[in-house]
């Protein structure tokens, strides 16, 4: 259906949302836009990573056939309000927010707590996607993320502080924690958008998420 509707000028520019999960666990701490099929996707999200790889490949082929300007974005750890809560399958921030607000005590987090990730609020992600679509450069492949990282232990403590909760925090080192540091090289992204990447701080974003959760659950 996409390939047939793409014949219209309305569809001559498309954006496909991939994921940073396509990248392998090996490589630098700050990941640039790497080759799509370089080694296997990260182990903790391997199925999802492969699905996104094939999505990129499929739409890249269709865009060439239909002469479409295809923008492919690879977001890193996006969070925000209106998140779909799916229990143990939720990503880190929404899962921790829910468990802390549900008064789970002790609170058990996976891994050592020292693993570091970069996080970007959904507002900034959507804003950046809009700027990418407005950019005249064709056939863009770009990461959406930041170089700045925060440890899981610090993330837990921030959520507890903002929510006014004080559970006993335990870290289960028998559970997988993925690569130790995962962040995004922002060189290409900064060139494309010509604007700041982060406008919603991690503290402000978590506060928004907590308030939304309280109002809706």
Residue ranges and their predicted role:
Residues 12-14, 26-27, 67-69, 106, ...:
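Active-site loop of short-chain dehydrogenase/reductase
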Residues 60-65, 97-101, 134:
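Alpha-helical segments that scaffold the active site and NAD(P)H-binding pocket
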